[in-house]
Amino acid sequence: MLRHKEPYVLYRKLLGFYPTDIHLYEQACLHRSSSICEQGRRINNERLEFLGDAILDAIVADILFHKFKTSKEGFLTNTRAKIVKRESLNEIAVKLGLDNFITYSMRTSSHNNY
């Protein structure tokens, strides 16, 4: 397989390593508005986003659980919700430059959900 150098270099710069499966990273950056059809299935980032959200929730929950050892469940839940809310994640994505990786359709009126 011939590797296209540019995406690998960009991901290396952002992540600190070269991705093993570049197609998985490309799919993660494919907004629903730019879905492609493959074997009768619409391919985009939604399933990977679901998985990533679940993993992020678990990681943040673990960090908060260990950092705030005497805090009640309500505090931990509210704090986690504030950290992983869409607006916070969008702001982080822009600061990291992830918005430059997202492929979306120009027809979409709002594309700030990375």
Tell me what each language-model feature is.
Residues 1-114:
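RNase III-family endoribonuclease catalytic core
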